[in-house]
Amino acid sequence: MKKLTIALVAHDNRKADMVEWAIHNAEFLSHHHIVCTGTTGNLVRKAMEEKGVTADIACMHSGPLGGDAEIAAMVVRKEIDLAVFLIDDLNPQPHEADIQMLLRQCRVHNVPIACNRYSADLMITSTLWDDESYVPTEPKSVSYTHLTLPTK
């Protein structure tokens, strides 16, 4: 399988879910580069080490301190292949604008994003990751970047 760069982000009330998901999928994740927001990454790394799994995990800042924005910038630069973002939909987040920015950039730049464990499981088990004949279709909105704007 080709080596992917996978972003893992989880709100405080979903961090336990993320750690459980990462441990459940540790074998898969150990073959890929993982980029996380700070606290999530440290928790995932510790849990994997306790299970004896070596993983390539890079931690950005904590989400409220700009980690979501750092990962969104990586999406724009085409450095992220897949994002798993376990969102706490039951409580307001002080950095809601950053959260929406990350979700929006994934949609705009055609990066698959899973917002629950089931969709994350479906995405990581997709055979399309290794299908060299499959080329994701760019969203039609991307064509707007090629428009010639009128000049004065």
Predicted regions and their residues:
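Glycine-rich phosphate/diphosphate-binding loop of Rossmann-like nucleotide-binding domains
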Residues: D12-E20
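Short internal beta-strands
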Residues: H32-V44
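General beta-strand structural signal in soluble alpha/beta enzymes
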Residues: V35-T37, C59-H61, F85, I113-R117
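Glycine-rich, charge-decorated loop segments at or immediately adjacent to ligand/cofactor-binding or catalytic sites
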Residues: R45-A47, Y118-D131
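Active-site rim loops that border cofactor/substrate pockets in soluble metabolic enzymes
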Residues: K46-E70
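Mid-chain, well-packed structural core segment of small domains
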Residues: D68-Q100
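Conserved small/polar residues in nucleotide/adenosyl-binding loops
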Residues: T145-T151
